[in-house]
Amino acid sequence: MKKQFQIAGLAAALCTVAAGCVSAPPAMDYDKLTADIIKTSFRDEGIVKVTVLDTDETAKACSAADVMGKPLDEKIAKAIEEINLKTVKWPADGKFIGDWKEGEKIAQNGRGLTYSDDGKTPNGGNCYNCHQITKEEISFGTLGPSLYSYGKIRGVTDPRSAESKAVVAYTWGKVWNAKAYNACSNMPRAGHMGILTEGQVRDIVGLLLDPQSPVNQ
């Protein structure tokens, strides 16, 4: 809790500095004005609530750094990563590796979380929007690094072995909450934000690490 207050205070300080001229209104006033305008411009619709626009201290700190056009302070970044690492929910049954075939379907699927969805259909991961994953799929984004050969280049031949434990745990944590390892990562916090279920995260990890997955062929 103490670190959360520290991050909030530092983020506020960054925003104030970003305001520039002393005679101008404080930057935080602009932030509040913008937030108020946005909230009054939207309404709840279907499963989507206006609260989806709310941001936590992690997002605020990263946004403040963007305003300044500088990397996040190293100490703040470390504190953010520690806070987010604590939110990672490890598999209840201890099983990290799921069905890579299902993982591929999730990676290809970009549906979900819109007002026209009923909330009953599982969300997609939309992973190909930012990553190359298999060589068969030629339509992919490049915002994130290529994940092709993800397990192979990390020497994972048996993802269920003790030797692979560290890589497997890291991969699970990265999918669950990427900001646990990179404070201002552009990658969605898929598990933490409820975009993907525990089972879906398991299948995505399987897609990335199973030697039989086309990712590692």
Residue ranges and their predicted role:
Residues 91-92, 116, 190-193:
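Generic anion/oxyanion-binding catalytic loop in active/binding sites
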Residues 115-126:
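Local sequence-structure signature of Cys/Sec-based thiol-disulfide redox active-site neighborhoods
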Residues 33, 38-43, 98-102, 128-129, ...:
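Extracytoplasmic electron-transfer domains, predominantly the class I c-type cytochrome c fold
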Residues 2, 14-113, 174, 207-217:
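Post-cleavage N-terminal segment of exported redox proteins
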Residues 113-116, 136-140, 214-215:
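Secretory-pathway/luminal and periplasmic proteins that interact with or process carbohydrate-rich
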Residues 95, 119, 139:
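Residue-level marker of regulatory loop/turn positions in helix-turn-helix DNA-binding domains and
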Residues 1-9:
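Bacterial N-terminal signal peptides that target proteins for export
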